[in-house]
């Protein structure tokens, strides 16, 4: 399965041109810049129009207007994951968004603890601590995402940090992908 991974488009998704062929396109958050409903509607319209068989997205820290939202009337091939998952062609995707409310309320360890052990592709907005998370010599990843090493998915896809954009295979054959350069027209293509 080919996965096109994009993230952190911050309302500039229309700048992504000539995207490669893939079976699934995944957006790991920060679809908006200001977090407005208008930005979300524009993104969803664009995302639904993409020529991929399956489309999955989660929310990032800029997408707070989606906190507690129930997105209805999405086409059958478009999936918004909010602490839940979907199986596509036998591959189990699970998505955990990044909402400031959950972070401030201390809910992230519980939410990460719910990641199913049989997850194949984990989607979060933020990286785990120490993996593709360094900016200016400081690691900004989330310590509570250590659950990734218990689950050991085939891939962990995220964004959030714009200066470490690459795919890298690390530790116990888990492939980590940071595609946070979406607003600059960058993406990652993975095969699992």
Segments predicted by a language model, with ranges:
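Active-site-proximal segments of metal-dependent phosphoesterases and phosphodiesterases across multiple
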Residues: 32, 37, 118-152
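Acidic, histidine-bearing metal-coordination/catalytic regions of metal-dependent phosphoesterases
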Residues: 1-14, 183, 192
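Binuclear metal-dependent hydrolase catalytic cores centered on His/Asp/Glu-rich metal-binding motifs
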Residues: 91-121, 138-147
